[in-house]
Amino acid sequence: MELFVSYKLPKHEEAAFNLAKEFGLTCLFQGDIDKKENNLFYFFVYKPDRSCIRRGSGNLSRDIYCNFSDWSVNFKDPLLSRCLKGLPEKFTALDATAGFGKDALEIAKNKQCQSVLLVEREKWLFYLLQEGIANAEIPEVLKFINKFSIKNVDSYEHLSNTKSNFDLIYIDPMFPGVGKSKAKRSIQALRDLTKEIETDGLLDLAIKKATKRVVVKRHKNSTYLEDLKPNYSVKGKVVRYDIYNSS
């Protein structure tokens, strides 16, 4: 689906247009948007304090943004937590498909985690990550967020060129919806708006670069990424995590 940058107040016009130029998107004033058809599009709504993504701009549309303060308290992924067992004290991690940063936060919440590098190639999504980190001011959240560093770059390109070592590399190539269950708004937005990641060679490269393991998130019925069989899998009702040990 198509994404536009929008703004509500005339005083925000210049900042919104500058962002649209940076993102390579069209900028629209909210008052000029056709209310009958705007649910067919997504809007990056510029606000100086917290920007967001919305599908449509009507009253039923809801803000989508990086809410680390809420996620640190109300979101847990016990399956992903199980995938981190056995990693060394002060392990370092790279999230090759950062998205909104929710899974990276779960990794950072592990007491043994020292740092997480979030790699995100979409410029608008990288901007939301930056804002989410800047707005996380609660001490209970900062102890996790302070482990973050972020880069706006293609993950394959970064892994090919970096000299840094990572104990854990995490990959979540967004899989399409399966079955009748409705995806959460943030997940659906990623499916609709992010370009499909060219994963050819990414997993193989990650296995060579990681010092301990690579974790790949898949739908429970999906084939193995790059047809590479994992050492083992951690399975749930909807998703599974394939674990590849580095040699």
Q: How would you label these PLM feature ranges?
A:
Residues C113-V119:
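Short beta-strand element of Class I
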Residues A96:
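Conserved beta-strand/loop positions that form the S-adenosyl-L-methionine
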Residues T199-N245:
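Conserved Class I SAM-dependent methyltransferase catalytic core
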Residues M1-T92, G101, V119-L168:
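S-adenosyl-L-methionine
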Residues F100-C113:
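Conserved SAM-binding loop of SAM-dependent methyltransferases across substrates and taxa
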Residues K90, N165-I169, T211:
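Local beta-strand N-terminus motif with an aromatic residue
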Residues P173-L202:
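Mobile active-site "lid"/loop adjacent to the S-adenosyl-L-methionine
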